[in-house]
């Protein structure tokens, strides 16, 4: 199974507002950059879309180390929240699950790969996370008309 490292980030101006996401896929000596955005979105949707888009770009099952500065995503996976939401028919104990469409899509993708999620501090010394942030901000600014 191929071993791939993924970095993702999201950015939003206002919440909701224009937003963007960026992702890097690292395989051997190759780095592939991906990015996108939406005119009216939230920071959490952009974080999720970054992860979903990066994993979706893989053409075969892989062993993935995914790095995100989103505690929302890292905690949902690493603390078992995602599995709990799924077991409760995609609901939280206090009601509606936000971004259910994206969580369901991510869950399907995770079943195709072996993925380990890592939280990294945003806007720090990690050059890969910082590049994802740059890509996300470029997209956010594009959708905000800057």
Give residue ranges: language-model regions.
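RNase H-like nuclease fold core
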Residues: 1-45, 49, 53-62, 133-146
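RNase H catalytic domain
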Residues: 11-18, 52-131, 135, 140-142
């Amino acid at each position: 199974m191929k071993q791939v490292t993924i970095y993702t980030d999201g950015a939003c101006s206002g919440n909701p507002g224009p937003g963007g996401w960026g992702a890097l896929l690292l395989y051997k000596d190759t780095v592939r950059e991906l990015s996108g955005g939406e005119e009216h979105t939230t920071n959490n949707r952009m974080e999720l879309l970054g992860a979903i888009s990066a994993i979706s770009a893989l053409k075969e099952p892989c062993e993935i180390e995914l790095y995100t500065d989103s505690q929302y995503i890292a905690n949902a996976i690493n603390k078992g929240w995602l599995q709990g939401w799924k077991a409760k028919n995609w609901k939280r104990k206090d009601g509606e699950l936000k971004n259910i469409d994206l969580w369901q899509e991510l869950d399907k993708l995770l079943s195709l790969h072996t993925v380990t999620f890592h939280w990294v501090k945003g806007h720090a010394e990690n050059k890969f996370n910082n590049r994802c942030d740059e890509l996300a901000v470029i997209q956010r600014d594009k959708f905000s008309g800057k």
